[in-house]
UniProtKB/Swiss-Prot annotation:
One of its GO terms (biological process) is terpenoid biosynthetic process. This is ER-bound oxygenase mpaB. The chain crosses the membrane at residues 22-41. It comes from Penicillium brevicompactum. It is an enzyme of class 1 (oxidoreductase). It is found in: Endoplasmic reticulum membrane. Belongs to the mpaB oxygenase family. Residues 352-376 are annotated as: Disordered. It comes from the Eukaryota.
């Protein structure tokens, strides 16, 4: 005795040039075959990455270059796990507010603790990091973003207001948070190749920024590969949090403007009910991506910063969170889904606030380039044209 089909499927079956007994196996085959196909396609790209960047053994990964690490991480961030890479980076920034020495400095500067400056400062920070991770380490744009970041930190380092350990902790979060988020919430775990790329990239970026890793166990003798650095900085950052991430009024003062939801910032923990709801949603998302959602094509790679300048030779961000800093007021940006969400939440859309938060932004300057090697001052001031502020 066969089971009756639902009415909608019965109508569809009658409309097809097959009998019911012929159509049902096709439908069942599709239900079984489609998830298998999607899973195969998703893992196929991962296999292609391993062939393109061929490091057959753990020992061979010690030869991974900065450029190779950048390209591997870029594919992860823009094609494989774009949502978790972005979200983990935001949480990494928020998590630093749980360290009193960091939150005290931020509130003293007023950049993160006041509504009128917090979103601007957050956007500038995101833009600097975006320039470093979305452009090749040998590119002019990455070069100048590193130089500007070093300049912004230099005064505070010289005065002792920024601790070397706090800088390493911040660097560590941007390296390990994506790993933690992907391992817990994404449709697959990371391979040793990808872990090595993340460790190699951020260790190299830390060196370029003048952030020492000597405090780590292998810091003075040298790291075998990016994986070893990543593992050691992960353990060290957790120990650092256990020792220094304590409740402090300044933690919350900084986090209030960035909506950080950490217990160390003196916010209440979410109820078990809400935790269960979001855990369930994330588990469902994982299954949908693995078995139902085709892999993201290269044409739809997620990038938060324009790869080419506009007619005025300026670069713009491609998306925004609350206030549309450095967003071009195009028709799509003013009337697309993101604009409607912003409008419903009572936030401005691109173009509403004129030049203050519009396409031109701050003029910027070439400070931060002066401490680099002779002969490199002639580089185009790409980052200056991106208009990040230099006033901390």
């Amino acid at each position: 005795m066969s089971l009756p089909l639902p009415p909608a499927l019965s109508e569809l079956a009658r409309a097809l040039p097959y009998s019911r007994t012929q159509w049902l196996p096709i439908f069942v085959g599709f239900l079984i075959g489609y998830p298998i196909l999607i899973r195969a396609l998703r893992y196929k790209r991962h296999g292609e990455m391993k062939k393109k960047f061929y490091f057959p053994t753990r020992e061979s990964m010690a030869e991974m270059t900065d450029e190779e690490a950048f390209l591997i991480q870029k594919e992860m961030a823009q094609l494989e796990f774009p949502f978790m890479f972005l979200t983990s980076g935001q949480f990494a920034l928020f998590r630093t507010y749980g360290i009193p020495t960091i939150s005290h400095l931020l509130t003293k500067t007023g950049q993160f603790s006041k509504p009128e400056t917090s979103f601007k400062r957050y956007t500038d920070t995101a833009a600097l990091i975006g320039e470093m991770v979305e452009n090749s380490p040998t590119s002019q744009r990455a070069f100048i973003s590193v130089a500007r970041t070093r300049f912004l930190h230099s005064g505070y380092q010289a005065s002792g207001k920024i601790l070397d350990a706090d800088l390493l902790y911040t660097l560590a979060l941007f390296a390990v948070q994506p790993v933690r988020f992907i391992e817990n919430f994404e449709w697959r775990t990371l391979s040793d190749l990808e872990l090595c790329a993340i460790g190699t990239f951020w260790k190299s970026l830390g060196d370029a920024l003048g952030i020492s890793s000597e405090i780590l166990p292998s810091g003075k003798t040298g790291f075998k590969d990016g994986i070893q650095w990543l593992e050691e900085v992960d353990v060290w950052s957790q120990d650092y949090e256990a020792k220094y991430m304590v409740p402090d009024p300044k933690n919350r003062e900084s986090a209030d403007q960035a909506t950080a939801m950490l217990i160390s910032n003196r916010y209440e923990a979410p109820t078990p009910g809400w935790s269960m709801v979001f855990s369930t949603l994330l588990a469902i998302r994982k299954l949908i991506l693995r078995y139902l959602s085709p892999p993201r094509p290269a044409a739809l790679a997620v990038s938060n910063i324009a790869q080419k300048p506009d007619k005025d030779d300026r670069y713009h961000r491609m998306s925004w969170d609350a206030l549309p800093f450095y967003i071009r007021p195009t028709f799509w940006n003013r009337w697309g889904p993101m604009a409607w969400i912003s409008w419903l939440m009572g936030h401005p859309v691109p173009g509403d606030l004129g030049q203050k938060k519009g396409p031109q932004g701050d003029p910027g300057n070439d400070e931060g380039i002066k401490d680099l090697k002779d002969g490199e001052m002639s580089l185009p001031l790409v980052w200056s044209k991106y208009h990040a502020t230099t006033n901390d």
